[in-house]
Amino acid sequence: MSERLLVLVRHGQSEWNLKNLFTGWKDPDLTELGAAEAKDAGRKLKAQGFVFDIAFTSTLIRAQHTLDLVLKELDQTGIPVRKDQALNERDYGDLSGLNKDEARKKWGDEQVLVWRRSYDVPPPGGESLKDTLARTLPYFVQEILPCVLRGECTLVAAHGNSLRALVMVLEKLSPEQILARELATGAPVIYRLNADATVASKLDLAA
């Protein structure tokens, strides 16, 4: 039986990350730094000897561009790639496109902090982290995890909050624990899974 390998990569810095804007389902591309982060992720995975069988990403360009750059560094651009909005970033609703300082002026520091850091309180017209997990987890269980358990080396390039959903189920974290977990941009996290989908080992390639 092949190893059951799953690699998660958060997209590199986007143009709106740089401008300190709430992004969500808006679709800015990577900055030069973000592209460099993605290429570096590919080099790190190449140094580890990874050969991927399949990749998953969101419908947003910053994640797709990250995946493309990673696969180019690996010389593995021909593998199947599945794109689905289930892996999209949390939808920030009325906050999307706003500078975070502007949002604090409009709604107040405390309210914006609640929207950003609570588990189940959504911003107006948007999703809470709980809502994001409810969208992402079924896709992971039904589409991604079966590939891993079949022994297919699987790469997922997505977003901070959608990847939190995967980390939450893989590491069996509580809502409080997942809220505290930050995923670095462009830093691969490698999971080796047991046959029952529990984590046998984890390696974080951040910096």
From Swiss-Prot:
Its EC number is 5.4.2.11. GO terms for molecular function: phosphoglycerate mutase activity. Gene3D superfamilies: Phosphoglycerate mutase-like. GO terms for biological process: gluconeogenesis; glycolytic process. Substrate binds at residues 10-17, 23-24, 62, 89-92, 100, 116-117, 160-161. InterPro entries: His_Pase_superF_clade-1, His_PPase_superfam, PG/BPGM_mutase_AS, Phosphogly_mut1. It holds the Pfam family His_Phos_1. Pathway: Carbohydrate degradation; glycolysis; pyruvate from D-glyceraldehyde 3-phosphate: step 3/5. The keyword rRNA-binding does not apply. It catalyses: (2R)-2-phosphoglycerate = (2R)-3-phosphoglycerate. Keywords: Gluconeogenesis, Glycolysis, Isomerase. Catalyzes the interconversion of 2-phosphoglycerate and 3-phosphoglycerate. Belongs to the phosphoglycerate mutase family. BPG-dependent PGAM subfamily. This is 2,3-bisphosphoglycerate-dependent phosphoglycerate mutase. The lineage of its organism: Bacteria, Pseudomonadati, Pseudomonadota, Alphaproteobacteria, Hyphomicrobiales.
